[in-house]
């Protein structure tokens, strides 16, 4: 998606050779107009899959997922990373390692919100090692729902996550795929 690539080039900051800081428009301060265009693009890519729910993980995927959900006219479910007394104890669980945070979380989704009648679209802001998407896919599998696809805003194509998910047969669509971030310079896969 050219609009997203241009915004990354304009406002993104490379830290080291593997961290891309896009908090000014994607995952801290959110550019809702950009999210609207991303939501339209995800709908264009996955409308034929008859999606019934969108699944993401807290926190950075929620904004994009909610905007995209308007185009599918479906609800959004987000997997929680923390235990809470007000979360139903009857939940699907999965272990997820966060590349950004460098730690493992147990994510959970109440069994009340996913079932075998659903076709799920997973949406997230970043794809690096694929662990978040795999954890969410594991939750979809536990529920008996069908995984319609995985929509990613920014994929780090030089890391193994995208390859891993595609080799498992998942329909992964990334709006921007970064092929390199060496020496502070970004390049994209066309």
Curated annotation (Swiss-Prot):
| Record EC number | 2.4.2.22
Q: Which InterPro entries match?
A: PRibTrfase_dom, PRTase-like, Pur/Pyrimidine_PRTase, Xanthine_PRibTrfase
Q: What is its main location?
A: cytoplasm
Swiss-Prot/TrEMBL catalytic activity? XMP + diphosphate = xanthine + 5-phospho-alpha-D-ribose 1-diphosphate
Keyword list, A-Z: Cytoplasm, Glycosyltransferase, Purine salvage, Transferase
Recorded hits in CDD domains, A to Z, give: PRTases_typeI (cd06223)
- Which positions in this protein are listed as binding xanthine? 20, 27, 156
Quaternary structure and interacting proteins, as annotated: Homodimer.
Q: Give the matching HAMAP family.
A: XPRTase
Entry function:
Converts the preformed base xanthine, a product of nucleic acid breakdown, to xanthosine 5'-monophosphate (XMP), so it can be reused for RNA or DNA synthesis.
Q: Output this protein's name.
A: Xanthine phosphoribosyltransferase
Q: Which organism is it from?
A: Ruminiclostridium cellulolyticum (strain ATCC 35319 / DSM 5812 / JCM 6584 / H10)
- What phylogenetic lineage does the species belong to? Bacteria, Bacillati, Bacillota, Clostridia, Eubacteriales
